[in-house]
Amino acid sequence: MTLAGLSNSSTKSKSHLEVHELLDRFELLYDDVSELKDLRRAILDKDLSSIFRLSSAFAISSNGYLIDELRKSVLEENQYSILRLLEFYVNKKSLTTLTKTIKNFPKSNIKDAYSRGQLHSKKWLVSEVEKIGMHLGTVFLCAGWYGTLATMLFESEKIHLDKIRSFDIDPTCWQIAESINKPWVMDEWKFKATTQDIHSINFNEYTYKTLRSDKTERELFDKPNTVINTSCEHIENWQEWWNKIPNGKLCILQSNDYFELPEHINCVKDVSNFKSIAPMATYLYTGELMLGKYTRYMLIGIK
């Protein structure tokens, strides 16, 4: 069974997440929640010790009703019961919005956005930004796709920011990004996604048109403090784009050495190569993350 409730393989959408993928991704994202490992083992492996630990904990707490949800999860792999258990343990707004987004946008590529490589890369970024401890202010998220990084930044208890503006040239992205980040869209547009070529952005101060949920236009004005681009390998005319960013801006960049993909037109071979195409006055962090087929590189600094 899939998260979208589609059990027939011929009807599966690109956005569906199988039960094992759903459990794996949330265990990866929230590795500090030890019960998620028991939940995965109970549902996928029918591990008796895990089932016993979970059911015993429910029985002695005020959450005895969850025993029935656990039974349905283990015996039927009931998606709604699994989601209720995940909501109980994780207690994050993003779980509910992700579920609704998958149902409402069956043709989206949410499965790719929540791949292990994507989540590892973004979790790494969040971890290093937490260590640096700088207030991000207004964030311009370039090539923001479905805004999963925005969700992780908002949910971090150690990262402080004012708002996130996500820009992507793909017109199918903004509604999905806003669906996933709905709690922050509803909070006076603390999150807002816009269809925009990032080459046309003024990174000093930017007046631009965006769409409300009813698709009527509204003009916005923002002055970014932080520029994030985790898709540098996709950016055409890289130097032209990089030159648009003023000195003094906090920049967070990721690229990779996955040259084999034709859409990767701006890969780098190592951190030194990355620094040579994205020179900064001060580097606050440089590093790499091995991801099997390729290595991802990250630069955080003041241009």
Enumerate the predicted regions with their spans.
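S-adenosyl-L-methionine
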Residues: 3-5, 12-135, 178-221
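Conserved SAM/SAH-binding beta-strand->alpha-helix loop
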Residues: 169-172
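Conserved SAM-binding loop of SAM-dependent methyltransferases across substrates and taxa
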Residues: 146-160
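Conserved class I S-adenosyl-L-methionine
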Residues: 135-146
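Short beta-strand element of Class I
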Residues: 162-167
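A short SAM/SAH-binding and catalytic strip from SAM-dependent methyltransferases
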Residues: 221-238
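C-terminal substrate-binding/active-site "lid" region of AdoMet-derived donor-dependent transferases
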Residues: 236-299
